[in-house]
Amino acid sequence: MKTFSAKPQSVTRDWYVVDATDKTLGRLATEIARRLRGKHKPEYTPHVDTGDYIVVVNAEKVRVTGNKAQAKNYYRHTGYPGGLRSMSFEKLIDHAPERVIESAVKGMLPKGPLGRAMYSKLKVYAGAEHPHAAQQPLELNL
């Protein structure tokens, strides 16, 4: 019996919607990253993007444990000398709640062109509304 290897043109992708309300950030991000990679499918192939599309709603209601709300910092650089900026989880969840989930998931995906293709299938929205109703996403309970 030969080992199955998925071809990029033969991959079928589903759309899923995930509600992040009162979910722990890391536990939610690991399951999202797993599904973006396609590791939940029997036809998973490491060098082919076999993952599904994931729409995350209510990103502003995601939780962290312990004192991470104050202690966890997110860093970015403006591109100018001395341009390192940091923001705590508390401030970032008020300012741009999508970035919290996006950065957690992005760190769990492969680095390189394949990882960027997987990351592009992640859609995160702060509120309960999303513009992907035409894709008829399935509810995913994590």
From Swiss-Prot:
Record protein name field: Large ribosomal subunit protein uL13
Native organism taxonomy: Bacteria, Pseudomonadati, Pseudomonadota, Gammaproteobacteria, Oceanospirillales
Q: Which family does it belong to?
A: Belongs to the universal ribosomal protein uL13 family.
Q: How does it assemble?
A: Part of the 50S ribosomal subunit.
For this UniProt record, the keywords arranged alphabetically read as follows: Ribonucleoprotein, Ribosomal protein
A GO molecular function annotation here is:
structural constituent of ribosome
List the source organism.
Chromohalobacter salexigens (strain ATCC BAA-138 / DSM 3043 / CIP 106854 / NCIMB 13768 / 1H11)
Keyword Ribosomal protein annotated: yes
Give Gene Ontology CC terms: cytosolic large ribosomal subunit
